[in-house]
Amino acid sequence: MKTFALILAGGQASRMGGEDKGLALLGGKALIDHVIDRVRPQVSHIAISTNRNLEEYARRSPHIFPDARQWQHFGPLSALCTAANDLQLAAADWLLVVPCDMPYLPDDLVARFETVSKRTPLCNAYYVETPITMHYNIMYIRPQILQSAIPYLFSGMKTLRSWLQQQRARPVRFEFDGHFADLNTQIDLQEG
């Protein structure tokens, strides 16, 4: 089974003062490098969605792409709509989607998603649930459902939560919320 990863690094980083969040440093290392180190052993390919510093991100993965112009500034759904037309991603059986600002992702993230997907083979989308909250921006999805994000976004809808609900996505429970801490501000980075 081929699982690819799509790392979302295309946001405006308004809470980070406009600094490119994926390249912000945590312990002397870019946030995206922490994320790549966590997911690389779990997947066979990594793609990065980013809208700036393309050359810098290309050093980390040759498979990078910006949001298509018509979908820019619609958050993570912009990346999903653009990815819907990416033939390389379409070759995967599953796509792990994670943001660039979660440096503590668990080493068994894909294994846990795979286990649940084998028990529920008709389900095409999963997301993380912890005792504290739902993390809709961490998804394990069939690449074929990405096409449905396009009419969803054109209809004026913009949230991952309702798109995942439309896909009848199921939560996968993780007990330790600390794995999913997102570092959105400079203060978060200092405390991280």
Curated annotation (Swiss-Prot):
One of its GO terms (cellular component) is cytoplasm. Mg(2+) binds at D101. Its cofactor is Mg(2+). GO terms for biological process: bis(molybdopterin guanine dinucleotide)molybdenum biosynthetic process. It is found in: Cytoplasm. Coiled coil: none annotated. It is an enzyme of class 2 (transferase). It catalyses: Mo-molybdopterin + GTP + H(+) = Mo-molybdopterin guanine dinucleotide + diphosphate. Keywords: Cytoplasm, GTP-binding, Magnesium, Metal-binding, Molybdenum cofactor biosynthesis, Nucleotide-binding, Transferase. GTP binds at L8, A9, G10, K21, D67, D101. GO terms for molecular function: GTP binding; metal ion binding; molybdenum cofactor guanylyltransferase activity; nucleotidyltransferase activity. Pfam families: NTP_transf_3. The keyword Membrane does not apply. Its EC number is 2.7.7.77. HAMAP family: MobA (MF_00316). Belongs to the MobA family. Transfers a GMP moiety from GTP to Mo-molybdopterin (Mo-MPT) cofactor (Moco or molybdenum cofactor) to form Mo-molybdopterin guanine dinucleotide (Mo-MGD) cofactor. The N-terminal domain determines nucleotide recognition and specific binding, while the C-terminal domain determines the specific binding to the target protein. Monomer. This is Putative molybdenum cofactor guanylyltransferase. It comes from Neisseria meningitidis serogroup B (strain ATCC BAA-335 / MC58).
